[in-house]
Amino acid sequence: TCIIFGGAGFIGAHLARRLLATGRASHVHLADVRPSALAGQPGITASITDVRQPIPADLTPEPPAWIFNLAAVHREPGHEAIEYFETNLAGARNVTAYATAVGCANLYFTSSIAVYGPTEGPTDESAPICPVSPYGGSKYPAELIHEYWQQAAPGRRLVICRPGVIYGPGDPGNILRMIRAIRRGYFAYPGSPDIHKSYGYIEGLLDSVAFMMDRPEPLLRYNYVEDPTEPLGALVDHVKAHLGSRAPVLPLPLTLLVPAAGLINAALGGNSPIHPVRVRKAARPTHIVPGTLKALGFPFRFDFRSSLIDWQRQAPQDFA
C-alpha cells in the first residue's frame, strides 16, 4: 500500500497510475481535501482528508510502505500569505506524525524550486535558500520538518524533491497555455526571450520518483527539471517547430504587460488566467540544474522537444 496526500491533483493522479502500472504498489490510497476522479478504479481508494488536521491512523487497512506528501497550497495568486504557511507547515507536521503513528519508514515530499527565489545563473541543490514568495517561504521550513522526522529514528528514509513547473497530459497549466497562445498567434515574451525557464515533464518526474525509491541513502534532496534547462526563446522555438507555426513571437516589456494584465483581470472580475502576478512570475528567471540526479547517473528520457512529442501521443486532445 502507498498513500498519496494531495493525491487528487495532477501529479498525484499520474503517480498513482504509474505505481500501479509498474507493480510498485498493489493498492494506492489518495487522500485529499478534494474528491479524486480515480476513486473506485482497480487498486485505488480515496478519502477526503485535510492535512491541516491530525490524520487518523486507520486511513488504510494496512500500514503504507511509502507515503507521498504532495499536499500543498501553491497557486499564486489566489491565497493570503498566511494560508501558505498554515497549510504547508501544518501539513508537514501532520503527515510526519501520521508516518510515525503507523510505522512507515519511507517518505517522499515535494517541495519546490521556489525555495531558491529567482535564479539568474545555473542553480543546483547546493545554492542558498532565498525565497521571494510566501509559497517558497513556506516550503523550506516544511522540508526541515520532514528532515526532523527522518533523523528522529533509525531506518527512516526521506526523499525531498524540488520540482520546477510540472507539465504534461491533462494539465491546463503554463506550458499548455503557451502552446495554445503560440498556435493562435498571440503569444509574446514577457520581457526577454533569453531568460532561462525550468520545467519538468510529468513522465520524467515519475521516472525520478522510481529512481529515488530504489536508492539506499537515508536522505536525498534533489531538483527535478528537464536537462538541459533552456532559454524561453528556445522553448518557444521548440513549440513552433512542433506545431509547424510561423507566427512571430515578439518580446514585450513588463511596463506594458503588467498594466495590460491588470486591466484584463479587472474586466473579467478577477478570474483571468492573465494576472499581473503571473506575468511578473513568467518573466522571472529560473535557471535550475538537476545536480543530484546528474551526479547519481539518472537517465533523463526527455528534453523539452521530445516531451512535446510524447505528450501529444498520450493526449492529442490537448493539442487540438
Show the residue positions of the predicted features.
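Conserved Rossmann-fold NAD(P)-dependent oxidoreductase catalytic core, especially the SDR/UDP-sugar
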Residues: 94-134, 154
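NAD(P)H-binding glycine-rich loop region in Rossmannoid oxidoreductase-like domains
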Residues: 51-87, 98, 116
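Conserved C-terminal active-site "lid" loop/helix of NAD(P)H-dependent oxidoreductases
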Residues: 37, 202, 237, 260-299
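Substrate-positioning beta->alpha
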Residues: 171-177, 191-213, 219-220
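N-terminal Rossmann NAD(P)H-binding glycine-rich loop of SDR-like oxidoreductase domains
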Residues: 2-21
